[in-house]
């Protein structure tokens, strides 16, 4: 009898603790991201979000009874906000040592991406030496060593743009020879352009995650639901 009572008490405690750990009842969690198609697409005119990562956020809202409000910020602003503890969470976010000091990351990624190379001259996509070329990249995104070393890409030759859209403008104006960015995102931005060619780098993968301000949610419950979502 004592064992049954003890199990019942532990069950009640676990349920209560889980609900409290997720978020205060009815509290809105403000979650920041940036325009990152096709995973997160922000329509400025309609002020709405679509994309595969948004579908995951909607699933978490429904399955866990959360109220996550998605907020769009430019990437440069997103980087600054991570250390200020003003917002509750961020998504489509890669990990690094600095970010992990301020945020709790899920173990399961929202998606895994690869880098891509974009150019006006298709014949240059398979070059092996980029040491004398001009390359545009999104500011704040690190180029993996596996790619930089193999293709002799030098930091001094990289022009950092404030957005992926700006990178493509630089390419179209021939101010750079190449763009390196997320392959799928680059294809999305290039779809309305004429004469832009692409190839995918297979030397490195980039998983991205949802990250929460410490203490806002039970990160294990979030992880469990993300895993379940992708196993459906």
What name fits each language-model region?
Residues 71-72, 76-88, 164-184, 192:
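Short helices/loops that flank or line small-molecule/ion binding pockets
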Residues 69-130, 143, 197-203:
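Acidic, polar ligand-binding/catalytic clefts
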Residues 42, 57-66, 107, 129-132, ...:
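Ligand-binding cleft/hinge of the Venus flytrap
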Residues 33-36, 111-116, 191-227:
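Periplasmic-binding protein-like
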Residues 16-18:
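N-terminal signal peptide c-region/cleavage motif recognized by signal peptidases
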Residues 54-63, 123-137, 141-142, 209-232:
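Extended ligand-binding regions for polar small-molecule ligands
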Residues 5-12:
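Sec-dependent signal peptide recognition
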Residues 24-97, 101, 137, 160-161:
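Extracytoplasmic small-molecule ligand-binding "clamshell" domains
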